[in-house]
């Protein structure tokens, strides 16, 4: 590869190395201002400080470069102004005009920029500030903008291109797929230039509407932010735009969905143009910045209304487009004070002070009546006189008392005179600038929330959590203190309800026994029929009395049941007991009361299960028990005739038991019939049933004999004990 081609190829990717190489070829020193920001991908310098011989390496390096991100060339030269201090010395000379102000140099700069735009795919921002661009320069620059595929921001501020030059640039901007921001501040534009901008916005809106329709097919949602076109237009400091240009722009932005910011400061807009913008916001919801400040013909109330509407569109979102800030009034107030010595009013030359600056004290108004305190000014006294106070001491005392000493009365020799020239400290433009700062606090302009520190947010979270815990603690303490006797009463009522429910369940159980034909168990337990009433009025007194009177009865029944089941078990095993064996059973062989109770409960459960065989056996036992009890009663009357009272009570007791046994027998016969039907339906043999019945009859006869003898023996023992107790 040829060396020149290799160097050119390397220079396209490294501006600094190629620039230094070209400077070395022409034996010149690289300018430090040019190399200052190259490392950051930015070429930014003041063109007024560049000599004609130094422009050639810069332009040749810029033509072939493909790596720069930002190109900014500025010129701040003000033609027609003499050097400072020329009047003082009486010397008048013309300032040296920098080479950038010539038409040949501006044309060469525009050609180099056009070449860079054509070959570069990384250049994003192009700024030409204060260059006197002619029509020829703008035409060649428009070709580069049309060929560019990467530039997004174009700024031609203070380039004095006019309406004709703007029309040339607009032809390239209209069809550019990448340019989003244009800045034509101070370009001597009129309402015609505003119409050119409006035509660009309208043309791009029509094209983007068609693209949005195409992307919305098949139920898709078009992304408006990704579409090409202008997003911000800046036309500040073009005083000839006026209301006509403002109305042309307002008509376009009313239907636009893509423009985000429009800057029109110092454009000669009055209330008519401002009202047109306010009407446009009835349909526009995407414009988040409309800067019409510094237009003194707009009322403050109308300006505030428009800015409020703009901030409502912003929705406190963090946008990439920000409001341009104006210089604060504090910076404007910092004016250098000039001091010089003049003759005092008495004709003597003394130390007098003249201060030219801004006064914090209001000036004296002619025709206004002031109080004696405001007009009081003591006469100065000569040195050495009583009450003399040096002026320096007086000034220090006034400063300590925060009293401004702008006005001092004229005095004699060696006295200081301070003269203050007041000027207005506020203007209509500054008032309009302050509106945005006030509204920022009320509506939170986008980006202001980012300045809040994370520590404050965490502190707020902790305070909120502490408040919530305090409220919970307070609620719990109040609930503990509010517990009174009523809650205890309610708890007692709950206990009573549970007891009542248990009684109702018990009475329901007794009703089930009665419905099942097992009411005799309740009679044996000593529970009267009156106890089967509703649980609302429990009648347990009769039950308690009968249990006290008939205490030995349950034990006796348990013994009888024990003998019955013992006899049945013997029959099942095939053992045959005679009368002698049954007589041999005495009180020593009887089971204990605990075993009898346990056996009684098991027998009751078997009865609740409706066992037909067991009920049949009980019926046989009860039928055989009746003659035995009658014989025992006759025997007791014959043997103990003298004891009529005891025998009478025994006979009545035996009669009651006999009646109970008869009822049991009748109930068992009724229950035996359905049981026999069920046995026939199940398919059992008649022979097995007859053998079981014969076996049951034999067991019942044996148990009746044993029970009758045991009952007779027990009744004799009880009668003897009662007789001995009476004696």
Curated annotation (Swiss-Prot):
One of its GO terms (cellular component) is cytoplasm. Residues 568-578 have a biased composition (Basic and acidic residues). InterPro entries: Cep78, Leu-rich_rpt, LRR_dom_sf. Keywords: Cell projection, Cilium, Cilium biogenesis/degradation, Cytoplasm, Cytoskeleton. Residues 579-592, 703-727 have a biased composition (Polar residues). Coiled coil: none annotated. Belongs to the CEP78 family. Centriole wall protein that localizes to mature centrioles and regulates centriole and cilia biogenesis. Involved in centrosome duplication: required for efficient PLK4 centrosomal localization and PLK4-induced overduplication of centrioles. Involved in cilium biogenesis and controls cilium length. This is Centrosomal protein of 78 kDa. It comes from Xenopus tropicalis (Western clawed frog). The gene is cep78.
């Amino acid at each position: 590869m040829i060396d020149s081609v290799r160097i050119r190829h390397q220079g396209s990717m490294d501006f600094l190395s190629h620039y230094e190489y070209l400077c070395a070829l022409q034996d010149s020193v690289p300018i430090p201002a040019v190399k200052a920001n190259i490392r950051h991908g930015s070429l930014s310098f003041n063109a007024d400080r560049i000599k004609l011989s130094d422009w050639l390496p810069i332009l040749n390096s810029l033509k072939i470069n493909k790596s720069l991100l930002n190109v900014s060339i500025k010129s701040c030269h003000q033609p027609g102004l003499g050097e400072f201090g020329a009047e003082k010395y009486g010397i008048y000379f013309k300032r040296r005009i920098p080479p950038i102000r010539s038409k040949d140099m501006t044309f060469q700069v525009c050609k180099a920029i056009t070449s860079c735009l054509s070959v570069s795919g990384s250049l994003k921002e192009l700024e030409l500030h204060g260059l006197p661009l002619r029509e020829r320069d703008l035409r060649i620059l428009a070709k580069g903008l049309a060929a560019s595929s990467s530039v997004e921001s174009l700024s031609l501020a203070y380039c004095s291109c006019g309406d004709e030059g703007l029309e040339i640039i607009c032809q390239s901007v209209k069809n550019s797929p990448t340019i989003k921001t244009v800045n034509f501040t101070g370009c001597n534009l009129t309402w015609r230039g505003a119409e050119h901008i409006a035509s660009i916005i309208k043309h791009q809106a029509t094209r983007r509407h068609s693209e949005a329709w195409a992307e919305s097919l098949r139920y898709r949602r078009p992304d408006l932010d990704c579409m090409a076109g202008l997003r911000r237009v800046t036309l500040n400091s073009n005083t000839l735009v006026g209301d006509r240009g403002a109305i042309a722009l307002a008509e376009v932005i009313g239907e636009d969905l893509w423009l985000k910011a429009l800057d029109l400061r110092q454009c000669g807009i009055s209330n008519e143009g401002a009202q047109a913008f306010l009407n446009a916001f009835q349909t526009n919801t995407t414009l988040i910045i409309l800067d019409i400040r510094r237009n003194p013909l707009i009322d403050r109330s109308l300006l505030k209304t428009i800015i409020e509407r703009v901030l409502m569109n912003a929705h406190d979102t963090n946008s990439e487009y920000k409001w341009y800030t104006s210089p604060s009034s504090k910076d404007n107030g910092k004016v250098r004070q000039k001091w010089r010595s003049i003759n005092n009013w008495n004709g003597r030359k003394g130390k007098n002070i003249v201060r030219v600056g801004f006064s914090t004290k209001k000036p004296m108004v002619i025709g206004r009546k002031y109080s004696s305190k405001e007009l009081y000014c003591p006469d100065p006294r000569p040195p050495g006189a009583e009450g003399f106070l040096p002026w320096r001491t007086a000034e220090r005392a006034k400063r300590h008392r925060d009293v401004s000493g702008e006005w001092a009365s004229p005095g004699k020799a060696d006295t200081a005179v301070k003269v203050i020239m007041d000027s207005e400290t506020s203007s209509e433009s500054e008032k309009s600038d302050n509106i945005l700062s006030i509204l920022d606090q009320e509506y939170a302009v986008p980006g202001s929330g980012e300045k809040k520190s994370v520590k404050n947010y965490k502190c707020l979270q902790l305070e909120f959590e502490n408040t919530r815990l305090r409220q919970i603690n307070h609620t719990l303490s109040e609930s503990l203190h509010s517990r009174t006797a009523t809650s205890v009463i309610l708890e007692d009522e709950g206990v009573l309800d549970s007891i009542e429910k248990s009684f109702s369940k018990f009475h329901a159980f007794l009703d089930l026994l009665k419905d099942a034909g097992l009411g005799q168990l309740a009679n044996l337990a000593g529970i009267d029929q009156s106890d089967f009433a509703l649980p609302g009025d429990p009648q347990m007194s009769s039950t308690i009395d009968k249990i006290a009177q008939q205490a030995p009865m349950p034990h006796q029944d348990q013994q009888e049941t024990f003998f019955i089941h013992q006899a049945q078990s013997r029959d099942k095993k095939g053992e045959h007991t005679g009368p002698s064996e049954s007589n041999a059973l005495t009180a020593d062989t009887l089971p204990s009361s605990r075993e009898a109770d346990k056996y009684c409960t098991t027998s009751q459960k078997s009865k609740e299960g409706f066992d037909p065989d067991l009920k049949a056996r009980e019926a046989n036992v009860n039928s055989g028990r009746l003659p035995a009890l009658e014989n025992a009663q006759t025997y007791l009357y014959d043997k103990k005739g003298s004891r009529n009272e005891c025998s009478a009570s025994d006979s009545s007791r035996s009669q009651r038991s006999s009646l109970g046994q008869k009822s049991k027998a009748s109930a068992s016969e009724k229950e035996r019939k359905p049981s026999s039907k069920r046995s026939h339906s199940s398919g059992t043999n008649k022979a097995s049933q007859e053998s079981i019945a014969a076996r049951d009859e034999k067991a019942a006869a044996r148990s009746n004999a044993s029970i009758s003898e045991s009952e007779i023996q027990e009744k004799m023992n009880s009668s003897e004990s009662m007789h001995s107790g009476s004696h």
